[in-house]
């Protein structure tokens, strides 16, 4: 063999002998560089075949004769294999992997797997130099790649499958727990938001039995509480001879009752207490004493009228003077308050109409002097308060009522609505006739036309409360309450919705309108 170099003059030749018959077979052991194998540190090495796969290639040993044997079993098995093309592989020990143990039990272990196809297209030779300087070349039969074995115990296929199923269960458990935690966090956040909203809107919280009751806002509920809460308050009225401080306490307690009351709470009682109870509660709210019970016309309950008249008879003259002063003072404030409330919402306007109609009559009665005429005769007033007996003073009192009502009508034409005028005129013939069957004056149980008006404020209030469809809005403004036809109501609602331009959302395939506060 010639050594290639810069100059062709220096040539060295070697003799290579290839033996024809060799008893030895040479194999190559390949180690990975990352394993950092150093042969100089090996003190002891043991190499053996791994024959653990021998059981796979073994056939089941069946008896050829005697008990449990089959006739021509081997022939039938061979015929079946030929039919399906099954070729049995023989167990060859030379094809099995090598096990290499270095430095005893405490050392490393390697497993050498035969690499196939290495000697198909190439021939590898191992050169060994002889003492005479010649080289002997031995062909390589097999190539083995050695990899280190892990010292820890590994799982079998069945154990690995069981662990894999367990892994899925564990992962599913973790995912379920994580979902629960996320749900709990979301619920906590929602609860915190609800608490914040409830703190901000604590005054607006109302509990309603029916959907139609939601039409009344917090202001409306107070106004309706004034009308509906008048009946029970008349019975609870204490004798007014105890001074002005108790009156102030009464006012505070009445306000609390108005906040809790709602529309329709006293419908069953309002017929019995319409004429008497409403007037007494109205007088208490305005800070005015109660007028004569006889002038009011029909009485609801006899005991109420008697108790109220007795309490009025017991009043000293000093309190009469104070009450006369109180009568004159709050009238402009009442007008101002009624105007403001009528501008705020339609529902509050309805309650103001009722209160104006009743207060106009009672103010007229209080300005007339029959109160002093009635004082000396306590028994006669008690007798006249009976609902069945006609009163002799009814004609004079009704004429004074009409005169006072006409004066008030001229002063309040600008602020009063036609409904209030109609209510006031209707109370005139009622006061004349001393019948025992009371007529509802407030129009609460039998709604008249025009009680509810389709306004922009009302629609805005409903839409800010919750998303609503046009059908829901039409239910809120019924033709019986508004006094309009269905076509007119639809047109007015369409114009108001155009002006408000609310947000549109599709909920359950239905268009819902809503407004933000």
From Swiss-Prot:
By sequence similarity, the record places it as follows: Belongs to the TFIIF alpha subunit family.
Matching InterPro entries = TFIIF-alpha, TFIIF_interaction, WH-like_DNA-bd_sf, WH_DNA-bd_sf
Q: How does it assemble?
A: Heterodimer of an alpha and a beta subunit. Interacts with GTF2F2, CTDP1, TAF6/TAFII80 and URI1. Interacts with GTF2B (via C-terminus and preferentially via acetylated form); this interaction prevents binding of GTF2B to GTF2F2.
What is this protein's function per UniProt?
TFIIF is a general transcription initiation factor that binds to RNA polymerase II and helps to recruit it to the initiation complex in collaboration with TFIIB. It promotes transcription elongation.
Modification Phosphothreonine, positions: 156, 331, 389, 437, 446
Q: GO terms for biological process? A: negative regulation of protein binding; positive regulation of transcription by RNA polymerase II; positive regulation of transcription elongation by RNA polymerase II; response to virus; transcription elongation by RNA polymerase II; transcription initiation at RNA polymerase II promoter
Locations of Basic residues compositional bias? 232-251, 364-374
Main localisation: nucleus
Know the name of this protein?
Answer: General transcription factor IIF subunit 1
Q: Which domain of life is it from?
A: Eukaryota
Q: Which organism is it from?
A: Bos taurus
């Amino acid at each position: 063999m010639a050594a290639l170099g810069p100059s062709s003059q220096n040539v060295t030749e070697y003799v290579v002998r290839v033996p024809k018959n060799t008893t030895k077979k040479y194999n190559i052991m390949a180690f990975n560089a990352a394993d950092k194998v150093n042969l100089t540190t090996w003190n002891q090495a043991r190499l053996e075949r791994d024959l653990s796969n021998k059981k796979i290639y073994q056939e089941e040993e069946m008896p050829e004769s005697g008990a449990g044997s089959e006739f021509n079993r081997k022939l039938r098995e061979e015929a079946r294999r030929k039919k399906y093309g099954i070729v049995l592989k023989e167990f060859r020990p030379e094809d099995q992997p090598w096990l290499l143990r270095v430095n005893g039990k405490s050392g490393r272990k390697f497993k050498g797997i035969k690499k196939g196809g290495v000697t198909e297209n190439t021939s590898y030779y191992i050169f060994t130099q002889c003492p005479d300087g010649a080289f002997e070349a031995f062909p390589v039969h097999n190539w083995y790649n050695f990899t280190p074995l892990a010292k820890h115990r590994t799982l079998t296929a069945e154990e690995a499958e069981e662990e894999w199923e367990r892994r899925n269960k564990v992962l599913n458990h973790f995912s379920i727990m994580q979902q629960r935690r996320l749900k709990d966090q979301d619920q906590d956040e929602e609860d915190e938001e609800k608490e914040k909203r409830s703190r901000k809107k604590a005054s607006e919280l109302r509990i309603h039995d029916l959907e139609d009751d939601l039409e009344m806002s917090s202001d409306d509920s107070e106004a309706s509480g004034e009308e509906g809460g008048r009946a029970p308050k008349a019975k609870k009225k204490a004798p007014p001879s105890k001074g002005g401080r108790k009156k102030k306490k009464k006012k505070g307690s009445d306000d609390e009752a108005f906040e809790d009351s709602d529309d329709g709470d006293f419908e069953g009682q309002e017929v019995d207490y319409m004429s008497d109870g409403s007037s007494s509660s109205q007088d208490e709210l305005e800070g005015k004493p109660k007028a004569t019970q006889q002038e009011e016309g029909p009485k609801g309950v006899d005991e109420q009228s008697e108790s109220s008249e007795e309490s009025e008879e017991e009043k000293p003259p000093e309190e009469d003077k104070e009450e006369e002063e109180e009568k004159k003072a709050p009238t402009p404030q009442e007008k101002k308050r009624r105007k403001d409330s009528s501008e705020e919402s339609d529902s509050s306007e309805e309650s103001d109409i009722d209160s104006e109609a009743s207060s106009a009559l009672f103010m007229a009665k209080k300005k007339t002097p029959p109160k002093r005429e009635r004082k000396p005769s306590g028994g006669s007033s008690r007798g006249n308060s009976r609902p069945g007996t006609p009163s002799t003073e009814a004609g004079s009192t009704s004429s004074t009522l009409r005169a006072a009502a006409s004066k008030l009508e001229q002063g309040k034409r600008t602020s009063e609505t036609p409904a209030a005028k109609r209510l006031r005129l209707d109370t005139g013939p009622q006061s004349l006739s001393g019948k025992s069957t009371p007529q509802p004056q407030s129009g609460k149980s039998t709604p008249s036309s025009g009680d509810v008006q389709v306004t922009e404020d009302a629609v805005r209030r409903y839409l800010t409360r919750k998303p609503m469809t046009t059908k829901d809005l039409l239910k809120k403004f019924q033709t019986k309450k508004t006094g309009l036809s269905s076509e007119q109501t639809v047109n007015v609602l369409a114009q108001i919705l155009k002006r408000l331009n609310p947000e549109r959302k599709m909920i359950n395939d239905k268009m819902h309108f809503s407004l933000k506060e």
